[in-house]
Amino acid sequence: MITDPFDTGPTGTFRTLCQKYPDDTVYSGADGFRSLWGPIFYRGRANGTARLLVIGQDPAQTEAVTRRILSGQAGRRVQGFVEKLGFSKSYLMINAFVYGIYNQNMAVPHLNDPDIQAYRHKWLEAAFAPGKIEAVVTFGTPAFNAWSAFKATPAGQSVTPFHHKALHPTADKPGGPITRKDLLDNWNVALQSFHANIQHPDVTKPLAPYGNDFTAADLPEIPSLDFPMGLQSWMRTKDFWATMSPTPGTERANISIEVP
């Protein structure tokens, strides 16, 4: 008998935000967004209990299946990061964009379009309303810019969590300028900063920096508590089970799922 706990869904203001959200007139396919895939709102505790806020960029094909953000390769890397900080459940992850992107050059300039920004700020305001968030990590430049835009508002100025900007979890793309070691060196700096400033982790842990590459221990299973009921365990423990073709198309694309 499987007895996995599952995410029972957002509550309060978070639930309202999942009931009323921007449509494809805001996130237009012509602007580089996969609006036909639908919005993917969060992962973690959308119920006012989070103490760590994680901001990413946008959901991809794995997230389109699980309906939770940061659940693919990037998600498992981020899970390892937050668990190194001692957070096993008291975190909330949101993205700068609530819809996926098929063209970065077209979509990212819309980061602070009025309707996109206003909706994102509502999520951030809801996250801070209970008064429990004590630290914020932004992964990548769009996430950092989204946080900076919020901090310029009266609501953002009223909160003072510790913040650190880290590289995007998949910044070490093959053939790119950022190596795996560059990424992990950057994350080690972030770990040191957070370790000195976090007051209430779920579990107190000694600082355990990354080496030159990810180890199996650095890539933990994403907790079933973060997903809707019935999601299979292999979807939480494997990478690249949801893929697109080398030329996936624009707003419309086929997702191939390989069951291990």
Where are the predicted features?
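A polyanion-binding, active-site-adjacent surface
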Residues: 1-260
